[in-house]
């Protein structure tokens, strides 16, 4: 699957978004190394802190099905420029994807920004930070 096909899947996922409060629909499509695609959309809740973003929905679906090796993630929304993942999504992406996974950000006008996970969140907090030997 190429980049444009994955973007099309992200746009399809966006159509499934449950965003009755913000009306801000986001879709994501995650391509595994073996060619499977997991789509995710944002799902809102009246208690905003309970909302889940499209990127995390796609990643959690994949991991819950046993897929943990990814090659590309596409995210699409109706924004002036390519959509920018929130900080929580950036952290989850950096935790569940290797640094070289390609992240494709786009909008409904077809503007595209492509980067690696490492470029998306440089200096990410990781499991290595939790296991660092510290003197108290």
UniProtKB/Swiss-Prot annotation:
Look up the record and name the cofactor or cofactors this protein needs: Zn(2+)
The alphabetical list of record keywords is:
Hydrolase, Metal-binding, Zinc
| Cellular component, GO, one term | cytosol
Name residues in a coiled coil: none
E.C. number, please? 3.5.4.5
Q: How is its cofactor bound, per UniProt?
A: Binds 1 zinc ion per subunit.
Where is the catalytic site?
55 (proton donor)
Q: Which SUPFAM superfamilies match?
A: Cytidine deaminase-like
GO process annotations (BP):
cytidine deamination
Gene Ontology molecular-function annotations = cytidine deaminase activity; identical protein binding; zinc ion binding
Residue span(s) of domain CMP/dCMP-type deaminase: 1-128
Q: What is the effect of changing residue 56 to A?
A: No effect on zinc binding. Strongly reduces Vmax
The record, for InterPro entries, names: APOBEC/CMP_deaminase_Zn-bd (IPR016192), CMP_dCMP_dom (IPR002125), Cyt/Deoxycyt_deaminase (IPR050202), Cyt_deam_tetra (IPR006262), Cytidine_deaminase-like (IPR016193)
Query: Which EC class is the enzyme in?
Result: hydrolase
- Main function: This enzyme scavenges exogenous and endogenous cytidine and 2'-deoxycytidine for UMP synthesis.
What NCBIfam families does the entry give? cyt_deam_tetra, PRK05578.1, PRK12411.1
Return the PANTHER family for the record: CYTIDINE DEAMINASE
Subunit info here reads: Homotetramer.
Q: Tell me what this protein is called.
A: Cytidine deaminase
Source organism (scientific name):
Bacillus subtilis (strain 168)
């Amino acid at each position: 699957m190429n980049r444009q096909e994955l973007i099309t899947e992200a746009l399809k996922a966006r159509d499934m978004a449950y965003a009755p409060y913000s009306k801000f629909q986001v879709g994501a499509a995650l391509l595994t190394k073996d060619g499977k695609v997991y789509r995710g959309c944002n799902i809102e809740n009246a208690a905003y802190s309970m909302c889940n973003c499209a990127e995390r929905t796609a990643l959690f679906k994949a991991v819950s099905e046993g897929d943990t090796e990814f090659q590309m993630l596409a995210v699409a929304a109706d924004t002036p420029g390519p959509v920018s993942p929130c900080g929580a999504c950036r952290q989850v992406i950096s935790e569940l994807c290797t640094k070289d996974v390609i992240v494709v950000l786009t909008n409904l006008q077809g503007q595209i920004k492509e980067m690696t996970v490492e470029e998306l969140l440089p200096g990410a907090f990781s499991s290595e930070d939790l296991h660092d030997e510290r003197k108290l």
